[in-house]
Amino acid sequence: NSTDAAALVRPGCALDREAARRGTSVYLPEETLPMLPPELSERRLSLLAGQDRPAVSVFVSLADDGSVRRCSLQLSTIRVTRRLSYQDVDAQINSGGVFQRLHAVLMRSRETRLAAGASGISIPELQVRLSRDRRVVLSVRERETPAQALVAECMILANHSAALFLRDNGVPALYRTQKPGSLRAAHRRADLPLAERVRLRHAFNRTIVETRPRVHAGLGLDCYCSITSPLRKYLDLVMQRQLTAALQARGPVYSCEQLRDIAGALQPVLTRAALVENERRRYWLFKTMEPLRGQVMPALVLSRRKKHYTVLLRDYLLEASADPPDDGAYEPGRDVQVLLRSIDPFEGVISLSIV
């Protein structure tokens, strides 16, 4: 289920215009800048326990092998009886019951996508946030938990189901597409060495938003769109409007040309939002590392260039250039020690050398 934001945020209203201007919620270490006002995103439209909420529901019947037997999409009213944390669901998956069975079936569905060419590469992620007393808190997510994997597969399944519905009913839509790359199956495994996984991350073709339903190679699906985050992504809100109109047997809210115009206008907005997120995350990370100037830290060689190496600082999962040592040469995957010569949080500049 995803909350039916389209029921309250009408096309062209003041809320819609502001949401289009923002394009997305922006997540910074120090704060979140929501696309929609908190009164809506955190209260009136949030799936709070014990409250009736309009929703778009995707009903899917899965076989034991993870294949889809039946699927339907409906407008609904739902009431959450109990909100579960990821930790709650992890515990229930480990102890048996419905969540364990659901997780097992969804992991077979994931295996089917992987066999169709989806990427299984997972890279540790450094999370940077500020505590209430303005301390920088760093944490590393090594890999997704069973609960996170379950939720991810549910979202992919819901979005794929919506894309199939829109495509098969001839409804104008914005699809997320990705051309197949040149990676061999051996390069899509999750158990590759870290240096290889980081290097291959840059080898995938970029995802494109377009009105033609084409393959999304990175997910191993024949078509894909995104409808599950209408409170924080404007394109999801737009697509939810198209979907709800079709479910109500009304004409489409947007034509293909209008959708292309919306996607084109939104692209620089989303690019700028991603840049701000990356710059603020980098700033606070560099503030944490600033007292370490002149110290040596572990790194992993990713690649070698004519005049420098690209390394990954292991403790911070940060890719950066490093000057070569006075003698010797290192191949990708080699563990080395690097000297932090200088770092400037305001300019976002770091200087390293292999020692």
What are these regions (language model features)?
Residues 1-334, 342-350:
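Electropositive polyanion-binding surfaces
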Residues 352-355:
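Short, compositionally biased
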